[in-house]
A protein has these predicted regions:
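Short beta-strand/loop segment at the start of cytosolic alpha/beta domains
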Residues: 1-18
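Residues that form or immediately flank small-molecule/cofactor binding pockets and catalytic motifs
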Residues: 10-12, 86, 108
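Amphipathic alpha-helical interaction surfaces in cytosolic regulatory modules
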Residues: 22-101
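A charged, well-structured terminal subsegment
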Residues: 102-114
C-alpha cells in the first residue's frame, strides 16, 4: 500500500505528521522527508510522526526516519514517533535505531513528551 502523508498543526505549536501504509523506497517516502524539511524551513521543529497506521518499513524508510530525526535535532527541535506498530518496531530494533529515535506508545504520550 502506498504511503499516505497528512500534516496538521496543533494550537500547542506541535506539528503532527500522520503516516499510513508502507514506508519504503520511492516518491511516497520522499514526501515524508520533504514535509519534515518544509517544517524546519518554517521554524516548526516540534514534530510528532503518528506511525500507528504504518504497516511496513524497509531500509530506505528507516534511513528517512533517522535522517529526519537528525535534521530536526540539528535545527534545535524535537521529533517523536507515536504508536509504532509491532512489525515496524521489530525492524527498528533489528537495525538498532530504536535506541536513537524517540518512540512513544501512542499519540497522547508523544504530545505530552514533546
Amino acid at each position: 500500500m502506498p504511503l499516505k502523508v497528512d500534516r496538521s498543526s496543533l494550537e500547542s505549536g506541535v506539528e503532527v505528521i500522520t503516516l499510513a501504509g508502507s514506508l519504503t523506497l520511492g516518491r511516497d517516502a520522499q514526501n515524508l522527508e520533504s514535509s519534515v524539511e518544509e517544517l524546519i524551513r518554517q521554524h516548526k521543529t516540534r514534530i510528532v510522526l503518528d506511525m500507528s497506521e504504518v504497516s511496513f518499513v524497509d531500509s530506505a524508510g528507516v534511513g528517512i526516519l533517522v535522517g529526519s530525526y537528525g535534521k530536526v535535532v540539528t535545527a534545535g527541535g524535537k521529533l517523536r514517533m507515536a504508536g509504532v506498530t509491532p512489525r515496524v518496531l521489530n525492524v527498528l530494533r533489528i537495525t538498532k535505531v530504536d535506541n536513537l529515535l524517540a518512540l512513544d506508545e501512542n499519540l497522547a504520550a508523544s504530545l505530552a513528551a514533546i
